[in-house]
């Protein structure tokens, strides 16, 4: 009798449906580039891992690195605006903000239509919001910031992200130093090992059925957002 019950239990376990794991998504964003060898190393690492990210590019750097700007676009990454000069937009007039975006727009690869503006430093104002709305841009914030620009300690950068990241987060990183790039690639490896899918911000919004609103800010897109 005991043997029969054991066999029955095994059969039940075989036919019981396996509960699917909840999908986990994170968007990685990179500010201030392109930056020559560091952006190139980051793009190589993203390509090797089959991962796409969102790049918030400065116009004056796009001017200096047109080939890298084109490569970012060609390899399926998302491009957003980060101003032309990287000056604080908070106290700029609408006219000056619009001029910054128009200068950057002229340097974008053909066919690239940004969906986001991330003001330098995240500093926003009514003028920033009004210009973003007029140019059909959502304002992109973030929910995880390891302050990678302030340290060369890759382990500290990685810990600051991996300790705090949750599904739906938008992570702020930079491609301006070797330590930032090495940390970013290690973070990606760790997230992939934890079954996260790393996506662009636009892709994350689509997965969350979130309609991007011009002139409105987003900082994270958790489930049911």
Describe every region a protein language model picked out.
Residues 1-4:
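Positively charged n-region of N-terminal signal peptides that target proteins for export
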Residues 9-14:
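Hydrophobic core
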Residues 19-107, 113-114, 186, 197, ...:
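Active-site beta->alpha N-cap acidic-glycine motif
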Residues 30, 57-60, 81-83, 119-121, ...:
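A cross-domain feature marking catalytic cores of carbohydrate-active enzymes
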Residues 31, 46, 79, 117-120, ...:
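Divalent metal-coordination and catalytic microenvironments
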Residues 38-41, 87-112, 121-167, 180-186:
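Alpha-helical scaffold elements lining the catalytic groove of polysaccharide deacetylases
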Residues 48-53, 62-63, 179-225:
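C-terminal domain-boundary segment and adjacent tail
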């Amino acid at each position: 009798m005991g043997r029969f019950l054991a066999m029955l239990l095994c059969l039940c376990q075989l036919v019981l449906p396996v509960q699917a794991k909840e999908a986990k998504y994170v968007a990685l964003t990179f500010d201030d580039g392109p930056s020559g060898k560091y952006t190139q190393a980051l793009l190589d690492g993203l390509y090797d891992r089959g991962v796409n990210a969102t790049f918030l590019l400065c116009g004056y750097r796009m001017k200096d690195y047109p080939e890298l700007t084109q490569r970012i676009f060609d390899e399926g990454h998302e491009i957003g605006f980060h101003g032309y000069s990287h000056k604080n937009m908070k106290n700029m007039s609408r006219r000056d903000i619009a001029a910054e975006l128009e200068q950057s727009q002229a340097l974008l690869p053909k066919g690239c239509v940004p969906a986001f503006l991330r003001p330098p430093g995240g500093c926003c104002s009514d003028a920033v919001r009004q210009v973003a709305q007029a140019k059909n841009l959502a304002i992109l914030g973030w929910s995880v910031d390891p302050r990678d620009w302030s340290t060369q300690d890759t382990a500290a950068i990685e810990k600051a992200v991996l300790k705090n990241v949750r599904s739906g987060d938008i992570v702020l990183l930079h491609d301006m130093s070797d330590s930032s790039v090495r940390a970013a690639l290690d973070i990606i490896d760790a997230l992939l090992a934890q079954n996260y899918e790393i996506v662009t911000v636009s892709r994350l919004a689509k997965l969350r059925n979130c309609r991007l609103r011009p002139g409105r800010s987003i900082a994270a897109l958790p489930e049911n957002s």
